[in-house]
Amino acid sequence: MKFYRIYIELTNICGLSCSFCPTKRLPAQTMSVEFFDSIVRQAKAYTTEVACHVVGDPLTLSNLHEYLDILEQHKMKTVLTSSGYYLKKHTYQTLFHPTVKQINISLNSYNKNDTSLTFEQYLEPILRLCDEKIRQENEIFINLRLWNLNEQMSEEAYNEKLFAAFSIHFGILLESDTIMREKPKTIRLDRKILLHFDHYFTWPSLDNPYCGDGRCQGLDSHIAILASGKVVPCCLDSDGVIALGDLRLHSLQEILSTDRTLEMIKGFREKRAVEKLCQHCSYKSRFSD
């Protein structure tokens, strides 16, 4: 069994309250460096890439460099996903750590929060990050996410401000009308700096309408490990509703070999959603064929 990526949640703390994220039901928790090391030692048998995120922001951690050092020691590549609010907490030595292959910045975090920061104050460290990447000729990818193309008037003004700022900074013409009409997946701002577009999605919940069967990438391309050590089948199960096991009690190999895990894998291969949460998840419709 191999995965393209394993999501390991260093912390479930993000410091924000974005309207597009689910209300956190689990207590605030940060995975210790020692526990993280024990998990990575097991995870490297299944993948070569770790995403340090489920719902928390890894950049809230002042000792992020320690976690990245561990990933480098185990020859893993890393993806960091952040709101962008905590970039100033870290040096470029940390942000451009040799283990980091990509940094994702969720640009929707600004307009979906009440904040004292001005738009310019929010964007400035993001643009500086891009400038430093260009200056260093660093091979890292910077992925600027704007996942609101299904929104209409409520997002238009914010998007236009972003497009204007990026147009000036990168010397590229970004026209809101054209983007909304053509709906590109990505626009290249500079070498390995991409503006990535998508739609908001509904997080799975037992309170959601019944969605039926279907395929999923969970337990196929990836699994996720929450800050508590619980293993879940996909990166959207942020509350651990489908806790396949706890790494404080069992090994990853044992957890991935249980009847429950194997039945989920078999079900998805047959386009069946075995677990109740999966039956109430609309995200899997993206993988229907």
Predicted regions and their residues:
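Short loop/turn microsegments at loop-to-beta-strand junctions
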Residues: 219-221
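Conserved alpha-helical substructure of the radical SAM core
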Residues: 1-103, 114-121
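Short, acidic, Ser/Thr-enriched surface-loop or helix-capping motifs
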Residues: 225-226
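Conserved AdoMet/S-adenosylmethionine-binding subsite of the radical SAM
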Residues: 61-206, 212
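A short, flexible beta-alpha/helix-coil linker loop
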Residues: 25, 110-112, 262
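C-terminal accessory region of radical SAM enzymes
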Residues: 135-141, 171-211, 236-286
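Short cysteine clusters
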Residues: 14, 18-21, 216, 234-235, ...
